[in-house]
Amino acid sequence: MEEDWEQHGEKEEVPLPAKKPDANKWDGEDEEEEVKDSWEDEDELEEKKDEEKVETPKAKPKKTLQQKIVEKEKQKHEEAERRRLEKEAENMTPEQKLAEKLRLQKLQEESDLKNALDTFGVTTLAGGIDGMTPNTKEDFVELSDAIVKKLASYKSDPEYADFLEDLVTKLFAGLPSNNIRKVKGILDNLYLEKQKLEKGDKPKKSKGGKVKARLKLDGENQNFDEYQPKYDDFDEYDDFM
């Protein structure tokens, strides 16, 4: 019996036939395709493409009807002003045309300056008389001192006296007669004191024993209150102005 098992074991093993490929399948069909880990990679590519696209410029907002009306009215006004100036220029003398040209040039320069200040965020010019906006008595005193200081630099000019006469006339032309009379009295006293100083007279003592203050020839900020008159004493000077 043992011999039969040994003989059976010694028999050669018959190899199994190789499996034939399925004729219905294409070559390489069984190979696994490379699958992307996720769809996020594809989304990122799409976003990059969108960013690379040139943005289309947005169309300018259309003007409203009200804006168009305002703009049209402005154009009409400018055209009417231009025609008026042209008509006036036809009747002007050469001197008047030159003066008008200088006036327009000055206006243009002021407009350019204002635009430049607006561009840089400057609202007003710093300091100086132009920057003052007096409201109180102290403010007007400060303005007065600034004007006197400004004009003092021209007092040695030969035309200075004529300039002051013209300036005073223009300044007081619009004031009531009472104000003019008050200033007239101050000038009368100032004139008398000036005369005494120029002649070398000594100041007279008043009843109280005090010497009346002299006028400072070289001072810029003189106090003219001490020269204010009593108006009843100056009726004889009513024809001064």
From Swiss-Prot:
GO annotation (BP), single: formation of cytoplasmic translation initiation complex
Broad class of where this protein is predominantly found: cytoplasm
Annotated disulfide bonds: none
Gene Ontology molecular function: translation initiation factor activity
Keywords attached to this entry: Coiled coil, Cytoplasm, Initiation factor, Protein biosynthesis
InterPro entries assigned: eIF3-like_dom_sf, eIF3j
Biased composition (Basic and acidic residues): 1-27, 46-58, 69-90
Quaternary assembly: Component of the eukaryotic translation initiation factor 3 (eIF-3) complex.
Protein name per its UniProtKB record: Eukaryotic translation initiation factor 3 subunit J
Organism: Culex quinquefasciatus (Southern house mosquito)
